[in-house]
């Protein structure tokens, strides 16, 4: 089992759970995923659709990890953007933000550059 396969499997479990919870049980997602740091809005369901899409693409990544590497790159970019532009300013200002999500994102941003196969296609 490759590192990419492990990451795709983790995506299926974690992003799948967040996606399903956010789409069908948004109030629970508000309490658990974003740790009561935001008021309920339909944005929770929008984010749920996004995360469920990551999970579904990751299912394909279990079978074709090289072809689905762009999913991992996308995760690296959006998580790496969210941390300095959302989590860090909130932390510095003493404002609430989902710390569990921030820690998970931080781990992923550190791990993903070592998991992504940076070789050009065909190598």
Question: What does each model-identified segment do?
Answer:
Residues 2, 34-42, 63-66, 70:
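Juxtamembrane loop-transmembrane helix junctions in multi-pass integral membrane proteins
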Residues 84-101:
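Membrane-helix boundary connector in multi-pass membrane proteins
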Residues 105-123:
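Membrane-water interface at the C-terminal end of transmembrane alpha helices
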Residues 13-27, 112-116:
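Alpha-helical transmembrane segments of multi-pass membrane proteins
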Residues 40-63, 76-84:
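Core segments of alpha-helical transmembrane spans in multipass integral membrane proteins
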Residues 1-14:
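Cytosolic juxtamembrane helix and N-cap/initiation of the first transmembrane helix
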Residues 21-47:
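Interfacial loop at the N-terminal end of multi-pass membrane proteins
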Residues 24-31, 87-92, 116-122:
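Juxtamembrane "helix-exit" motif on the non-cytosolic side of transmembrane helices
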């Amino acid at each position: 089992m490759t590192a990419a396969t492990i990451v795709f499997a983790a995506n299926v479990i974690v992003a799948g759970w967040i996606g399903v919870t956010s789409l069908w049980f948004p109030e629970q997602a508000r309490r658990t995923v974003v740790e009561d740091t935001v008021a309920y809005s339909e944005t929770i369901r929008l984010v749920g659709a996004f995360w469920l899409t990551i999970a579904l693409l990751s299912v394909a990544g279990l079978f074709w990890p090289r072809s689905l590497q762009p999913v991992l790159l996308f995760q690296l970019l959006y998580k790496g953007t969210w941390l300095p532009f959302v989590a860090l300013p909130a932390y510095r200002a003493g404002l609430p933000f989902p710390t569990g999500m921030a820690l998970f994102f931080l781990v992923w941003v550190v791990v993903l550059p070592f998991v992504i196969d940076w070789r050009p296609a065909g190598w």
